[in-house]
Amino acid sequence: MAGAAPRRLGCDALIVVGGSAMPRRVLHVPVHVRACNLTQELSTGEDARFCRPRPVNVERVRAVFAALYRACPIHVRTEPERVKLVLGRLLLGPVAVPCFCDGEVEGHGEHLVPTTQFCRGPLLYVHRRCCCGSVTAGRALSYHVLENHVATHVLRGLLSLTEWNRELPSLFCDCPGGGGASGTEERYAMACLPRDLSLHLDDYPYLMVEIGRVLSVSEVDDYVTAVSGYLGEAAAPRIQVHYKLLFGLNVRPQAPCALDATRDFFLLELQKLWLGVEYHHEVTSEFFGRVLAQLHRDRARVMMALRLPEQTVCHLSTFVLSRFKRQVLYFKLQVSYGKCRTGHADRSGGGGNGGNQGHHNLLCYRRLSVTFADTDTVWRNLFYVYYELARDLGSHGTENRPVNRGYGVSCAPRTSRLSPSESTVVSANGHALSSTALPTTSAGHKLSLPRDPAADRVRRYVCIISRLMYARYGERWRKHRQRRSETGEEEEEETLESGETDATPPFDFTGQQLRRAYQEHRRRKHLAVQRYAPCRRKLIGGMEFAEVTGVSLDRIAVNAFNTNRVINMKAALSSIAASGLGVRAPRLPKNMTHSFVMYKHTFKEPACTVSTFVSNDAVYINSLNVNIRGSYPEFLYSLGVYRLHVNIDHFFLPAVVCNSNSSLDVHGLEDQAVIRSERSKVYWTTNFPCMISHTNNVNVGWFKAATAIVPRVSGADLEAILLKELSCIKNMRDVCIDYGLHRVFTQLELRNSYQIPFLAKQLVLFLRACLLKLHGREKRLQLDRLVFEAAQRGLFDYSKNLTAHTKIKHTCALIGSRLANNVPKILARNKKVKLDHLGRNANVLTVCRHVEAHKIPRTRLKVLVEVLGVLQSISGTPHTREVIHQTLFRLCSAAAATSGLCSSPPPLCVSSSSSVPSVPTSVSVDGSSEPTSPRVRFASR
């Protein structure tokens, strides 16, 4: 891009030999020399000159932009990067340096502007030539710093970073005598422009036009945020001022244009709020329709109400609580209700607003106060306009109360043609939600105002409004700065070790560093949420709805299965459907408590219970309490089934999991009684055989056979409790885990997504023990691998609908009452005993501890003795071997006493060659003298 032809301003311009215009040069000039600020003396006068009105020459502005574009470093090659560098110089703004010349400076007259001003200093004393003898064109000058001297010339340009000017030709020699070397040590420098290309205030919006041809508004906003973060808080005000000048905030348009632009701004913001609402139906469209109608009816008052600060308390004279609750639910706003204090009743002015210290976003009606969230001030003001300012309008924004036809907002027709700025919003059913509902009725104001001929001034407001839509990009950069400041100390240590002196990373001109940091942040957040999920799969509904929560510590893994969860949510009843079907809506007295259950529904498919609580506005809103076991899709399925029985308009998600109960089994323990010993800060319940362990304010109940229940928590809280419980188990002195069995049973749980029943576990335990008996303990690893592969292939899979091992109400409801009552039991000692009365997770040692030798046949006793002998041989702790030894002694002694061959049980003889105990000779184990044992039969109700 070629620059414009130079003009004469006080002296001759540079004479170019060759017939063609030579591109204007931008020179490097220091602004700080040995910590002396050269710009402070002329700052006031230069600011006045910069703000002085001056006719804008578009060609001169293009020449300035072209000169700055050519002044970019060589390594900045792409056009967007070069334009960003030009934008960075414009954001730092204009600057001027005074100097004194003892004569005419040859070759640099186009950059020196004559002036006569006494400066206290510092200022530059410019020599004609440097003492080093350098005769390079444009680099032959030298300078010294003076004070209390008259300045004869001024150098004007744009403030820049020294790193941006490294490849620019310098006005002064780089030798130590010339003084140019001292300026390179400073952070800031000046890109000196020719004197006929100096900038003024009115030139900035036109420079933004040149920038906008390459960069979008969002890219400009991101770059401004990045520059502010890179240069620090000291330079941020200067950057913000020049950033606003680029969009023409200094221009004050005429009154009609300003009013139209402000109205368009409010309309655009209201339409953005409307498009951000999830539900588009009669409730939401009626709300925005009334607000927009009041905006066109009383523009000034509504605009002032929408700008009310959060400290101002808004008082209402009319209010409908049931309608307000419904609107808040559909808008998904968090509000809290309370009593209006005496300080809130003080009103100020005609708007009915009172001030109160310490309270924010308050909406008061008589003795009721509604508090909005800190970020919902705009919504608070919208409700104030809806209930207070628009109370004299009809239900749909008109004074004559027209009949509602559809979900749209019916408005009075306009007689004049709509202007392009008067756009419409389309509702969910296709009807138009007009943003120009009513014309202004004030006297002397016409329906159509003449447009301002200065259309470029309106475009500046449009640019500012468009920039507001990209505020989230700046928020990302601020979060990135915060994360970088938290880890700044570690980065400085790494930088010092690597030998670099500047710990600040190089400035990112293209934004690639910011994009990489944001992608890394998203990846880490994704992994942090799913670090405990099986195979890192995404859990639909979140971790709170996970059916299985698995954690591991070293080699110990535990899977916690959800038994049931209680979910609270709200739903809106369909009053239209009820009236159309002839159903009378229930009318409840105002004094009924909200904790009272109005009615309850129990379903078999899916198995759940839905309780509906009392509400004073039960015609519109109900609070639901869902008790269910299952995943998030099953929960949504249950809501669909519930909707078939009750006239529900909408369910308001997300739901809140207020209570979640889980059950877990610790597999592979050789002695399961150890887990309830060696525990501190525990207590035993008197009416239930359970040991309570208090962890993270949650009472974890441990039953026999290493089974536990964890109430109230889910998700990350449940994982934290499980990890602490595993840490306690791991540090117990007498705990020994058979990792072969532990791996098999953990795989079975994950494969079937259900806890292992009693019979299925006993089958695997005794099958593995018999294999060890047949093949020897030397083949233990091979046998464990064989059993694990069989479990992986589904040989030991089991059904979820078995009820012999569960008390879960929902499972019984799922399979039916007849099958649920047929729970298998065994008849022992003339008493019915549940099949899993020893515990669902009981192992071989736990079962053998409770076996009575005189009640079972001798052949089975022989098998149990041999199995216990195998377990004693492979046990890893002396404690477990001692417990097995005592169990064997009890079984053999009981069998000997029953046979009547000896009066006292003889001691067990354990040989050194084999760990399997020898059975006393007085006891026959071959079955020849088998005593008469009570008949064992199955009984069912």
UniProtKB/Swiss-Prot annotation:
- Give the location in the cell: Host nucleus
Q: Where is the composition biased (Low complexity)?
A: 910-929
Q: Which domain of life is it from?
A: Viruses
Q: Which cysteines are joined by disulfide bonds?
A: none
Report the GO terms under cellular component: host cell nucleus
Which residue ranges have biased composition labelled Acidic residues? 488-500
Q: Name the keywords, alphabetized.
A: Host nucleus
The protein's matches in InterPro entries, at most eight in alphabetical order, are given as: Herpes_UL87_C (IPR004285), Herpes_UL87_N (IPR007618)
Identify the stretch(es) annotated as Disordered: 479-508, 910-941
Primary site of residence = host cell
Similarity comment text for this entry: Belongs to the herpesviridae UL87 family.
Physiological role: Functions concordantly with UL87 to initiate transcription from over half of all active viral promoters in late infection, without affecting host transcription. Acts on and binds to viral early-late and late kinetic-class promoters.
For this entry, the protein name equals Uncharacterized protein UL87
Q: Which organism is it from?
A: Human cytomegalovirus (strain Merlin) (HHV-5)
